[in-house]
Amino acid sequence: MELNTLAPAPGAKSSKKRVGRGIGSGLGKTGGRGHKGQKSRSGGSVKPGFEGGQMPIQRRLPKFGFTSRKAMVTAEVNLAEIAKVDGDTVELATLKAAGLVRKNVLHAKVIKSGELSRAVTVKGLKVTKGAREAIEAAGGKIEG
């Protein structure tokens, strides 16, 4: 088998319908667009969200909330992922090196999810109460 000899199985592909090519094709004359009206004209599409002149729903409803910019550079790391980090200390740089958080992350928080079997020192990361207990139970400690 060669790349240049690959072909779909016979009957697997059907040829596309050519519109406006005679009555016998089933898509002649109007080409499947029906008679008259905006959508039958060329360029006659209606933009998404347009409701025929009625005030659109995205303008009828009030604005609310905002997107936190800090949330974009914050990551959550669970205990099972911390166990994958090489070495005894876990900090933002080691998490990035292990590929557990993206490069643009500035803040990280350790959450209690999964198991931690070895002692690690967590530096400069926020830690939830449950995760703190699990780290200390495994013989680890939390610094700053």
From Swiss-Prot:
**What Pfam family is a match for this entry?**
Ribosomal_L27A
Question: What biological process terms from GO does the record include?
Answer: translation
User: What GO MF annotations does this protein's record show?
Assistant: rRNA binding; structural constituent of ribosome
Q: Which InterPro entries match?
A: Ribosomal_uL15 (IPR030878), Ribosomal_uL15/eL18 (IPR021131), Ribosomal_uL15/eL18_sf (IPR036227), Ribosomal_uL15_bac-type (IPR005749)
The question of whether ATP-binding is a record keyword is answered with no
Which Gene3D superfamilies does this chain map to?
3.100.10.10
On the tree of life, the source organism's domain of life is Bacteria
Q: Which HAMAP family match?
A: Ribosomal_uL15
Q: Spell out the family assignment given in the record's similarity comment.
A: Belongs to the universal ribosomal protein uL15 family.
**NCBIfam families xrefs:** rplO_bact
User: What role is this protein assigned?
Assistant: Binds to the 23S rRNA.
Record's protein name = Large ribosomal subunit protein uL15
Q: Which organism is it from?
A: Idiomarina loihiensis (strain ATCC BAA-735 / DSM 15497 / L2-TR)
